[in-house]
Amino acid sequence: MFRGVGTAIVTPFKNGELDLESYERLVRYQLENGVNALIVLGTTGESPTVNEDEREKLVSRTLEIVDGKIPVIVGAGTNSTEKTLKLVKQAEKLGANGVLVVTPYYNKPTQEGLYQHYKYISERTDLGIVVYNVPGRTGVNVLPETAARIAADLKNVVGIKEANPDIDQIDRTVSLTKQARSDFMVWSGNDDRTFYLLCAGGDGVISVVSNVAPKQMVELCAEYFSGNLEKSREVHRKLRPLMKALFAETNPIPVKAALNLMGFIENELRLPLVPASEKTMELLRNVLKESGLL
């Protein structure tokens, strides 16, 4: 589907409504700086608080702006398999290139339940499916063995966004899934683990940081793929303060604040999320200035 950087793009709001004008500006910023894919309505896109009509508007506008230049992957996960399938079919109808399907949260399925969830969906769509493993938010963890089973059996499940920060799990997930199917892709779901995942044989990152610093995140991956390990490590180290600052509060609170400081969007979220504290705002101002982004 893609190698490199897929930006998990924010959803801008203004006076409680979608701000498509600011959104277009942000999408073009991503395209101009060479990102390899856009992930719309993921965690960073505040998908739980975006309604069905808004989803359609946002996905349709994204596809219009991107115009086939890079893949557009749409977040379509819920904790109901049937509701998830409904969102997948909506994305398919609109012309998305793939769907990001988070593991069912709150109801805590077993490993067999996780496998059956993805099997059910994969049998009912032709879209490429990306498994999204983020145990810190969902309460369930896709074990490397389960990821490998999915890779072996479900051919239109194209990869996994691995947001478990455990380095050992990252390594095992990459190793076992690639053994099961050589074209199965593994992307980091944590910006600060991107370099480590690449070293383990992974394929890139679905990134929050690239909302703000797309050029730098693209460079991190591109240098690695070109064999310039030291340069990639250097970019990673330079980005560390920004990576840390953008997770000073719950994502996407800091990244929206940063984009506001950069003049891209209003600093507006939907409840239960609230804007960043002044302490975080000051941290972001300083880090953005030090990074040459402000």
From Swiss-Prot:
Query: Where does this chain mainly localize?
Result: cytoplasm
Q: Quote one Gene Ontology molecular function term.
A: 4-hydroxy-tetrahydrodipicolinate synthase activity
Q: Where in the cell is it found?
A: Cytoplasm
Note whether Transferase occurs among the keywords.
no
CDD domains linked:
DHDPS
Q: Which reaction does it catalyse?
A: L-aspartate 4-semialdehyde + pyruvate = (2S,4S)-4-hydroxy-2,3,4,5-tetrahydrodipicolinate + H2O + H(+)
State the similarity comment: Belongs to the DapA family.
Briefly state the protein's biological role.
Catalyzes the condensation of (S)-aspartate-beta-semialdehyde [(S)-ASA] and pyruvate to 4-hydroxy-tetrahydrodipicolinate (HTPA).
What name does the UniProt record give this protein? 4-hydroxy-tetrahydrodipicolinate synthase
Whose protein is this, by species? Thermotoga petrophila (strain ATCC BAA-488 / DSM 13995 / JCM 10881 / RKU-1)
Gene name of the encoded protein: dapA
